[in-house]
Structures are given as C-alpha cells and as structure tokens.
C-alpha cells in the first residue's frame, strides 16, 4: 500500500477493499475491476482507495499477492508421492483465490504490478515447494540433478498456468496420475523405473 501523509489508514477498511477487489476479480475478471465498482460495493469513497493504491493494478497486486496458491505438501515418503500430493489441488475446481489470480494471467504479461502479485502468490511458493521436494529426494538418496529439478519446476508451473487459463475445470485422478507418470517423473529420472522414484 502506498498511502499519503495525513490521517492514518484504517486497516479494517483496507481489508474490506481488498476483499471486494478479490470478489470482483474472481467473479467478473480483471476487466471489471475499477474504483467505482470497488467503492460502491465496499460503501467507501474512491479517495480511500487511491490513498492506498495509486492504480487498480497496484490494488490487484496487494489483493492477490497475499495468497499462497501452492502449498508444500507434508513428506509423503517418496518423490512420486510428494509430487502427487503437490498436484492434488488440480483435482478440485478453482477456488475464489485461484479464480482471482487466474483473471490476471493474460494482463500480467504487460503489467509489472500484476506480474509481481502472481509471482508472490504462485511462482515463488511453487519454486519453494519444488526445492523442498528435491531436497527430500536427496535426503532419501535419490538426488535429482539441479538442471532437471529446474526443468520439473518449469513444466509444473506451465501446467499450473494452463489450469488457470483453461475453462476445463478440475482434472480427474487418472489424468493427474498420467501427467505425473508420463511427463513429470521421466523429467527427473529418465533412466529409472518410476516405481523406484
């Protein structure tokens, strides 16, 4: 939040404004987020919005950047099972936070604030999860070379973005297993049987 000198900003109003912004992004999309709509829904003045965020992109960054859209799974005992737990989210429809983030994907290509919000919500948490999963594999004596781990992260991220831009909805358990066994595991262990990973 930016804010200007003067009266302190109300944290409660800030939260209310961000919640309204998330609702608009999730239900109507980035193109419908504007100060008039936010102010009307929040029953607040537009000045209160612009004291906090100079642009709607800055507001969207604050709203979405607070999310953690990827969670590092608990240790499942194997690389395959850790990855399966990470990808389990793909089996459910997009929730409110994911729909809000998804609404920014196309526009983020041309807007630094939107990109930063998505980086904070998805890109960095996913990279941390992949790093943790790779470290666990190494601790089990199944080290994944750094280059292959980076490739794994890039491919999973691409699938995540596809999930956000597709109208297809959730994947089935079988589809997730097929992606895992036929695409992801061969990236990290091309010479090993998947069952041993």
Please name every model-derived segment.
Residues 1-41, 47, 58:
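Basic, helix-initiating cap at the start of DNA-binding domains
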Residues 70-100:
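Hydrophobic alpha-helical connector segments
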Residues 96, 103, 113-139, 150, ...:
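Amphipathic alpha-helical packing segments from all-alpha helical-bundle domains
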Residues 28, 97, 107-112:
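Short loop-to-helix capping motifs
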Residues 17, 32, 55-60, 70-71, ...:
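Short amphipathic alpha-helical segment with a characteristic S/N-K-E followed by hydrophobic residues
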Residues 127, 131, 144-166, 174-185:
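Hydrophobic alpha-helical segments that form the core
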